Amino acid sequence: MATTADFKNGMVLMIDGKLQQIVEFQHVKPGKGPAFVRTKLKDVVSGKTVDKTFNAGVKVEQATVDRRDMTYLYNDGSAYVLMDDKTFEQVELQPELMGDGAKFLLENSRVNVSFHDGQALFAELPANVDLKIEHTDPGLQGDRSTGGSKPATLETGAEIQVPLFIETGNVVKVDTRTGEYLSRVTQ
């Protein structure tokens, strides 16, 4: 059992027989009345989000979640295949569990997968990855009509917006959560 004081983003709770992950939370102490905690919870199975308010100090059942470090091997078209780093067991994950950031994964990338009762719940990808630019148009000096960015295709096939000074062959750091360019990587 956990109390509202133990809440953290990413924590998985068992509420009304359903696994709910805390997306965000806020402790609120109004000037009048008791303190409470506002949360945004995501149903791990269906993916739906719901807002729920708890009184401060309320005990909530925390789900036992086993987090395992895994290595991304390949995508067979219908599922992502990962290997457990300790047992070398291969696991197939559906695209919904990997999220939108999966398009930035290279083979042998590290992924943290959470399991409950042997069933994969969700995957946490690295916050950012370094990827090579496979193709982008040359940025011309003084070309500011496009707002200072241009499309670029990464080595994974994903397309992002990059600044005009980025060229084909450069390595860039990409945020896997938002798909945005962060910086150029110098080697």
Swiss-Prot record:
Naturally occurring in which organism (per UniProt): Corynebacterium urealyticum (strain ATCC 43042 / DSM 7109)
PROSITE patterns associated with the record: EFP
InterPro entries, per the entry: Elong-fact-P_C, NA-bd_OB-fold, Rib_uL2_dom2, Transl_elong_fac_P/YeiP, Transl_elong_KOW-like, Transl_elong_P/YeiP_cen, Transl_elong_P/YeiP_CS, Transl_elongation_fac_P
Protein name in UniProt: Elongation factor P
Record's function text: Involved in peptide bond synthesis. Stimulates efficient translation and peptide-bond synthesis on native or reconstituted 70S ribosomes in vitro. Probably functions indirectly by altering the affinity of the ribosome for aminoacyl-tRNA, thus increasing their reactivity as acceptors for peptidyl transferase.
Family to which this protein belongs: Belongs to the elongation factor P family.
Subcellular location, record wording: Cytoplasm
Tagged with keyword Cytoplasm: yes
Coiled coil: none
A cellular-component GO term for this protein: cytoplasm
Pathway: Protein biosynthesis; polypeptide chain elongation
Keywords carried by this UniProt record: Cytoplasm, Elongation factor, Protein biosynthesis
GO molecular function annotations of the record: translation elongation factor activity
Entry keyword annotation includes Cytoplasm: yes
Alphabetical list of Pfam families matching this protein: EFP, EFP_N, Elong-fact-P_C
NCBIfam families referenced in this protein's UniProt entry, alphabetically: efp, PRK00529.1
Single GO BP term: peptide biosynthetic process
